[in-house]
Design a protein with these regions (language model features):
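N-terminal export signals
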Residues: 5-28
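N-terminal active-site segment of His-dependent metallophosphoesterases
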Residues: 28-126
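Extended active-site neighborhood of metal-dependent phosphoesterases/phosphodiesterases
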Residues: 37, 66-79, 83, 122-224, ...
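Short, solvent-exposed loop/turn elements at domain surfaces
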Residues: 45-47, 55-61, 209-212, 301-304, ...
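Residue-level marker for buried hydrophobic side chains located in beta-strands
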Residues: 47-49, 113, 150, 227, ...
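Active-site glycine-centered loops adjacent to acidic/histidine catalytic or metal-binding residues
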Residues: 52, 115-116, 153-154, 230, ...
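Short acidic, glycine-rich surface-loop motifs adjacent to enzyme active sites
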Residues: 221-242
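Histidine-centered catalytic micro-motifs
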Residues: 228-233, 270-278
Length: 373
């Protein structure tokens, strides 16, 4: 299917498996949101992006009353995170969100948050849903009339009982996203479009490959295809948890390899978070290309509010952990940089290409510029 067919089918409302007619989504993104929702005839627009935010507040009893974990060490670590979150949301994170809101202009079509919008770790369905609602409405109030979309992160579905936390997410988020997109969102994997471009949201917690394959099929011919996923598609360079990527925990790599090949043949751009880092990876293989941009808004201390590259270049990928895990992927890497920086991001999209400006902390000028296409 070529791009002209994709556009014709989009206008006819024949794409968007999980959210219904894509034409409805496009109309809500372009035609019913006032000046900021005005469609650009030349296909040029911007997307404001926030990485993990881990919304929380003090005292920890506000959201975490009744929370416990059967593993005392793990619970102690989680409670350290509560304290970290409360401290950063008392000052730094509101400044970061305010800075992100200032990046919105008349060409901005979407605000995207990469998942882990909340800390999670609540004691039940309603508590998880309330925390999600409070976080979403906080960001929505700051960003104004521009549609806000998020994907499911591991913290968004983590609680005293993960099954109840996930139920809380399902209770709140699909309905709230339906309001943002102007059409029904039924599940955690869904697609919508902005003009000639396809956006496919993927739940990495419980991958539904068959649904994702259908979404890829139904959006063939898009100018650009963006994969919105909380975790990366490729392993990230860290001292631990490097296997926290799409299908990275599977003992059998067949599903991982199959989906990576499908993504590569579509030349997708992956917009993700999870690792609390600002990382750019451009990879060629499997008959195509995957460009991955990992983003972070966990401004945990003063140092993460500045941009400082820790590793870059082909040999830099995996250099921090030193794990053999990266040997499989390194030959396809054509561009790479890694920083433990937090901030906000502005993605600019046009026929000429795609770029992202990164604003560390609440800086008024770009700290880094990434060319994705």
């Amino acid at each position: 299917m070529d791009r002209r067919v994709f556009l014709r089918l989009s206008a006819a409302g024949l794409i968007g498996l999980s959210i219904g007619p894509a034409a409805d989504a496009a109309e809500s993104l372009h035609g019913k949101r006032g000046k900021r929702g005005k469609s650009s005839k030349d296909g040029k627009y911007s997307v404001i992006i926030l990485g993990d935010t881990h919304y929380d507040t003090a005292p920890d009893t506000y959201y975490h009353t009744g929370y416990s974990d059967p593993n005392p060490t793990r619970e102690a670590n989680h409670r350290k995170e509560f304290a970290r979150n409360a401290e950063m949301w008392a000052d730094r994170c509101p400044r970061l969100v305010k800075r992100a809101a200032c990046l919105v202009d008349e060409n901005t079509k979407l605000v995207y948050q990469t998942g882990d919008i909340i800390q999670g770790d609540t004691a039940g369905v309603d508590a998880q849903a309330k925390m999600l609602s409070d976080a979403f409405e906080y960001l929505k109030e700051a960003m104004g009339e521009v549609p806000l979309v998020t994907v499911a992160g591991n913290h968004d579905v983590r609680g005293k009982k993960d099954s109840e936390a996930r139920e809380g997410y399902r209770k709140f988020m699909p309905e709230r996203l339906s309001k943002e997109l102007g059409t029904e969102v039924e599940g955690l994997d869904f697609a919508f479009r902005i003009g000639p471009d396809a956006f496919i949201a993927v739940d990495f917690n419980k991958p539904d490959d068959e649904t994702v394959k259908k979404l890829l099929k139904e959006t063939e011919g898009a100018r650009y295809t963006f994969i919105l996923c909380h975790a990366p598609v490729f392993p990230y360079d860290g001292s631990k948890y490097s296997n926290w990527y799409y299908h990275g925990k599977d003992k059998d790599h067949q599903a991982r390899d199959t989906m990576r090949e499908l993504f590569a043949k579509r030349n997708v751009i992956v917009l993700c978070g999870h690792t609390h880092s600002t990382e750019f990876l451009d990879w060629y293989g499997d008959g195509g290309r995957i460009t991955q941009m990992t983003m972070n808004s966990v401004w945990k201390d003063d140092a993460t509010g500045t941009y400082s590259v820790m590793a870059e270049g082909i040999e830099g990928y995996g250099a921090i952990s030193g794990s053999e895990l990266f040997d499989e992927f390194r030959p396809g890497v054509k561009g790479y940089s890694y920083a433990r920086s937090a901030g906000c991001y502005k993605m600019n999209v046009s026929d000429e290409g795609i770029s992202i400006d990164f604003y560390a902390g609440d800086s008024t000028r770009p700290s880094a510029h990434f060319v994705l296409r």
